Amino acid sequence: TARAGTPLAELEAALAEQNQCLPFEPPHLRSGTTVGGMVAAGLSGPARASVGAVRDYMLGVSIINGRGEPLTFGGQVMKNVAGYDVSRLMAGSWGQLGVITDVSLKVLPMAPAEATLAFECGQAEALERLHAWGGQPLPLNASCWVEDGGAARLYVRLRGAVAAVEAACRSMGGERQTRASVPADWQDCREQRLPWFAQRAPQQALWRLSLPQTAPVLALPPGVAAPLVEWHGALRWVQAGAEHASALHALARAAGGSASLFVATSEDAASAEAPSDALSPALAKIH
């Protein structure tokens, strides 16, 4: 259990000392991120598609409602079935349901083994590979397809038991990444510090497309670069100006998903016809 104002970095450091972690890898995005902000924003990192989201690790929460009344929901242990499951509703609520004062979270031990494999392939082939692997008993943890410097690569992170990770490396192929910077690269993916994010032009917004994992490659408007693909195909980041807002919304809806304006200048936000689409009930369980 942590107070809402506890710095997220401080909590993660304390957990790491005990070989524990928050498996959903909440992004910080800037210094000073707090536990309460993490829950209110409801954002998850690269491992989201494999391990679950913030709400899946919520055990209990205390809030102050609109009448100034202190309320507590849930508990501090897994076996907790009393009352309404308001704790999970707080994840991604952006403070609309109350001011969070403290949070109880489920944590897990760090994986005993980890490996990252790289594959040179286009987006369509990357999605095909991810769909095929998803139907196999492989310790998939995170994935990222990115086109950088003219080269398109799919990176897949494996986590789990030593034997499972080693067996997956042998069966999946690809090039095993042995650089000391690999863990930092995944952190850069989580924190949007990869070169792909840095190349965004000042007049471009960063769009977050939430799609079914089985969605095909999207035919983006002319002049819009290939997306960065995470969550085994379910999350696609797109850099585009406000003039492409309508097209992105239409593409996402046609694929059974939604588009949200994630990072933009005030001018972009004002000119975009709608910052975000409502998620379908099925997608709301994933994103």
Whereabouts are the PLM-identified features?
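Short, conserved charged micro-motifs
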Residues: 10, 124-129, 163-170, 214-223, ...
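Hydrophobic residues embedded in beta-strands of well-ordered beta-sheets
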Residues: 1, 152-154, 235-236
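Residue-level signal for inorganic ion chemistry
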Residues: 5, 156, 238
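Catalytic cores of large soluble enzymes that bind and process phosphate-bearing ligands
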Residues: 3, 53, 78, 118-122, ...
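Conserved glycine-rich FAD pyrophosphate-binding loop
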Residues: 30, 177-287
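N-terminal glycine-rich flavin-associated loop
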Residues: 1-30, 39, 43-76, 111-119
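Short, solvent-exposed amphipathic alpha-helical segments in soluble enzyme
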Residues: 16, 105-106, 132-135, 171-173, ...
